[in-house]
Curated annotation (Swiss-Prot):
This is 4-hydroxybenzoate octaprenyltransferase. HAMAP family: UbiA (MF_01635). One of its GO terms (cellular component) is plasma membrane. It comes from Shewanella woodyi (strain ATCC 51908 / MS32). Coiled coil: none annotated.
Length: 286
């Protein structure tokens, strides 16, 4: 196998060919930096966090595939993943995970001690998450914590503290993550039931759409409070309204609980997050 072919496999293992996860991680992280800075964040901090999100998302994907390597081959959507298909060895995957983790830690060391301390919690959460699908019906709720951890880190990097407003944004992103990752889990629900993987899509059962709606409403409320705490104005409010519109569209997509529309609803959350981030940024400009 050529070096080019091997590199392509490593990139797929790190999910570099599917940026949706990186984008969903990026928008709340950037929102946190903007809110913490009261506008334009420090350029060094901004660059470190953008690179860090990409690297840590790759770490999360690699350790997730390691944990699920024996199950992914039985799930239609995941059977072609490099570890499940045997394109890379466990040793190669774990080596890549360590390398990416060291890169992420090197980035963190350029920031203040509080960020470094928070980063240890972040990597532990990242490693634990894939295994929660074995012993809890609520792995999406744990993922919400993992995917929101960049928010207190962003505030710490920008201000040296983690104020109350940061935790409102954390709560908003946690609720939003549970909502969209449950949509994602609805895609795999039938396969997950066969192989014994647990998820909120299975836990919520016939009430899945209603519970997702509740989490969307809770996320909306927390985003509003976070904006109010930061004294945001009309443009941010328009972003909130746009976020509501995307949420309603997602509810329409998941109504029939079919795989393709549910996956489309999950992907649509990228635009919901982008619209809210852009609205926040423009709100500071005007």
């Amino acid at each position: 196998m050529s070096v080019k072919d091997k590199l392509e496999i490593y990139l797929r293992l790190a999910r570099m060919d599917r940026p949706i996860g990186t984008l969903l991680l990026m928008w709340p992280c950037l929102m946190a930096l903007v809110l913490a800075a009261g506008g334009m964040p420090d350029l060094k901090v901004l660059v470190i966090f953008i690179i860090g999100v990409v690297v840590m998302r790759a770490c999360g994907c690699i350790i997730n595939d390691y944990a699920d390597r024996k199950l992914d081959s039985h799930v239609e959507r995941t059977k072609s993943r490099p570890l499940a298909s045997g394109e890379v060895s466990v040793k190669e995957a774990l080596t890549l995970f360590v390398v990416m983790g060291l890169i992420a830690f090197g980035l963190v060391l350029m920031l203040n001690p509080l960020v470094v301390q928070l980063s240890f919690v972040g990597i532990i959460l990242t490693i634990i998450y894939p295994f929660t699908k074995r012993f809890t019906n609520m792995p999406q709720m744990f993922l919400g914590v993992v995917w929101s951890w960049s928010i207190p880190m962003a505030y710490a990097a920008q201000t040296g503290t983690v104020p109350a407003e940061a935790w409102w944004l954390f709560a908003a992103n946690w609720c939003w993550t549970v909502a969209y990752d449950t949509m994602y889990a609805m895609v795999d629900r039938d396969d997950d039931l066969k192989v014994g993987i647990k998820s909120t899509a299975i836990l919520f059962g016939k009430y899945d759409r209603q519970v997702i709606a509740l989490f969307q409403l809770a996320a909306l409320a927390c985003f509003i409070i976070a904006g109010w705490a930061a004294d945001r104005g009309l443009v941010y409010a328009l972003g909130i309204i746009t976020f509501v519109g995307f949420s309603l569209y997602q509810q329409k997509l998941i109504y029939g609980r079919e795989r393709a529309p549910c996956f489309k609803a999950f992907l649509n959350n990228n635009w919901a997050g982008l619209s809210l981030f852009v609205a926040l940024g423009v709100d500071y400009l005007v």
